[in-house]
Amino acid sequence: MAAHGGSAASSALKGLIQQFTAITGASESVGKHMLEACNNNLEMAVTMFLDGGGIAEEPSTSSASVSTVRPHTEEEVRAPIPQKQEILVEPEPLFGVRQEQELRNGGAIDKKLTTLADLFRPPIDLMHKGSFETAKECGQMQNKWLMINIQNVQDFACQCLNRDVWSNEAVKNIIREHFIFWQVYHDSEEGQRYIQFYKLGDFPYVSILDPRTGQKLVEWHQLDVSSFLDQVTGFLGEHGQLDGLSSSPPKKCARSESLIDASEDSQLEAAIRASLQETHFDSAQAKQDSRSDEESESELFSGSEEFISVCGSDEEEEVENLAKSRKSPHKDLGHRKEENRRPLTEPPARTEPGTATNHQGLPSMDSEVLEMSPEKSDGIVEGIDVNGPKAQLMLRYPDGKREQITLPEQAKLLALVKHVQSKGYPNERFELLTNFPRRKLSHLDYDITLQEAGLCPQETVFVQERN
């Protein structure tokens, strides 16, 4: 019975050896050793053989003896960990709990949530969407002051204006009623141009400008809701509503070419035409020198009853000249045209009558600069300290001529208008304007000083025919 069991075990071992050799291609002796080492476990023996890269066909006797002993000493060695594939992190659901709740509630929660972007968002509903020039034009059309806010994204106080001040309903109401609100970033092109012109240094920055002249009236840096309302209320109490152009847009009409927009060639042509006209009227001017000298002492200004004294004539002569001008306006207009050409070509100092006609015949070029004599300027700014600070003004006339005059800073703007009118450019037909910033001086109050009008210490003033 025992012999029958031993033969069955040996036949089973032979079968395992044959399977091992068929799988691995090794010899029967190698298969026998591997099966003995693995306790007749065919799978483990094949794995061990393949992992070891194969074993020699006939191992030495010493290795054989070691292998024969190994089953007794290493029977407790555990099997290798089988290979398997698993996912370390399970995929998250496509929507979170909050998103699923919002979908179920129809987005009601999203309306209640206020993000940081909403808190610090600029006041789009208040802002003027355009450039600085269009904001000024809009302020003139709507008779509203121009409020400027320069934003620096690196300054948190500027962001607080968006969060606390501009979002307040009381602030919004007062801005909508009285101001054109223009906000721009400091590093933008418009912001850099504004900073360079108005010399901005501190942030946050809020200022109020007159849209007609571009003059800065007030400037604030630290504001909250209460202080802003107090400051704006005080400003409106002091300056009131802006009195400017009517809210109705002006009718478009054919506009003549202005002196500023004209090229040098066109200005030179205008000067040559004026010179030819002067030569043509030389004979008429020589006959009427005495009379035109008397009438040039005074001029009517803008339809008012005032007289503009240039050379200090007495009141009786002024009343007599006024009566003459009222009786024959067409004749007086002809005299004015003839008189106006003569002072532009005369030298600053008064000359003899015989030499005055010679100067009248000189051609007038664009490069000619006429300086105003102290005697004439004293007559215009009578009653003002002429020894104080001066304003250097370069006047450019429509005929291409230029005149440089010096007036005290405290002289009224009316004095400048009178001087231009004495040169033959009445206020009814001509206006004064500056180029940068482009503004019309004829729209300002004539009682303000040259310093308040922004013409100090020096400025170029253009005389242009009204449209």
From Swiss-Prot:
SUPFAM superfamilies: Thioredoxin-like, UBA-like, Ubiquitin-like
Gene Ontology cellular-component terms listed: nucleus
Principal location listed in the UniProt entry: nucleus
Cellular location(s): Nucleus
Domain UBA intervals: 2-54
Biased composition (Basic and acidic residues): 330-344
Residues found modified as N-acetylalanine: A2
Domain called UBX: residue spans: 386-463
SMART domains from the UniProt entry: UAS, UBX
Listed Pfam families: Thioredoxin_7, UBA_8, UBX
Domain of life: Eukaryota
Cross-link (Glycyl lysine isopeptide (Lys-Gly) (interchain with G-Cter in SUMO2)): K84, K112
UniProt Ubiquitin-interacting motif (UIM) repeat ranges: 263-282
Biological role stated in the UniProt entry: Ubiquitin-binding adapter that links a subset of NEDD8-associated cullin ring ligases (CRLs) to the segregase VCP/p97, to regulate turnover of their ubiquitination substrates.
UniProt protein name: UBX domain-containing protein 7
Protein source organism: Mus musculus
Gene name tied to this protein: Ubxn7
